[in-house]
Amino acid sequence: MNIKNEKIAVLYGGTSQEREVSLHSGAAVTEALKSLGYNVEGIDTKDIAIEKLKEKGIQRVFNILHGGIGENGVLQGALEQMGIPYTGCGVMASAITLDKFRTKLLWNAVGLPTADMVVVQRGQAIDINQIIAKLSLPVFVKPSSEGSSVGVFKVKTKEELLPAITAALEFDTIVLVEEFLTGAEYSVPVLDGEVLPAVQIIPDGEFYDYHAKYLSDKTQYIVPALTNERQAEVAKIVKAAYDVVGCRGWSRIDVMEDQNQNFRLVEVNTNPGMTSHSIFPKSAATMGISFEKLVERVLELSI
């Protein structure tokens, strides 16, 4: 069947902490598909129950929700129950990868490199001295299940650590305290199993937080950022990371270098941002893939 004859919904917005970013991504994706002649409707899931999609005659979904039910497997399961094909990862990969803790457990189990971490759960006693003894300072404190750097803190002093953990626990019941990696930061897109050129991120500020990601015009994105040899090295790690958690369609995997320039995996973004600041289209452009063609390719990969 020709997808252009189907009624397609771009799902965006929603109610997660990443709602605003998703609204921008959704608008861009909807406009791109319309420009290519698709029968497409943009739908903010804050305004409609998912089960109503079938009643509206929706035959296929481009899922560009960030965080929440759009990336944790709930939406994916509902769409499968209704028999509606959708873009991106399936139920299992979506559920696993929104949880940074369990993603890292899987990666570590197969020998993939990640930052060292201490896991803190809401309600448990927190031993600040023990954390510092293991990881030293500075450290990153982050909720296990939030994206877009929501609730992430860089902690430089012992006095800042407990307040940062307490604040992060407002967003999730599990918080990761991770060693601070001193090397360069990269984000590496994967499209239909092919690893695209890594994008180096030089943030406006101390780290790549929400402001640097979505609001600042001073954050620098360098692509291509690596020599062919280093790109091949990171691609091997990223492809293994993508496969072991069961990703499909498209995803973007964040990576950092440690002090010895070894790559360490950070996290997976199963519904990458598609705004004017977004990394995925910047990387795709170096391969001769326009924004519109990238959107169309992701849609074609929907199952």
UniProtKB/Swiss-Prot annotation:
GO terms, molecular function: ATP binding; D-alanine-D-alanine ligase activity; metal ion binding
Cofactors required: Mg(2+); Mn(2+)
Superkingdom per UniProt: Bacteria
InterPro entries: ATP-grasp, ATP_grasp_subdomain_1, D-Ala_lig_Van_CS, D_ala_D_ala, Dala_Dala_lig_C, Dala_Dala_lig_N, PreATP-grasp_dom_sf
HAMAP family per UniProt: Dala_Dala_lig (MF_00047)
CC terms in the record's Gene Ontology section: cytosol
Keyword Endoplasmic reticulum: no
Ranges of residues in domain ATP-grasp: 104-300
One Pfam family this sequence matches: Dala_Dala_lig_N
Binding site for Mg(2+) 1: 254, 267
Keyword Aminoacyl-tRNA synthetase listed: no
Organism of this sequence: Haemophilus ducreyi (strain 35000HP / ATCC 700724)
Designated gene of the protein: ddl
Function recorded in the entry: Cell wall formation.
Subcellular location per the Swiss-Prot or TrEMBL entry: Cytoplasm
EC assignment: 6.3.2.4
Residue ranges of the TM segments: none
Catalytic activities: 2 D-alanine + ATP = D-alanyl-D-alanine + ADP + phosphate + H(+)
Name of the featured protein: D-alanine--D-alanine ligase
GO BP, one annotated term: peptidoglycan biosynthetic process
Pathway the protein contributes to: Cell wall biogenesis; peptidoglycan biosynthesis
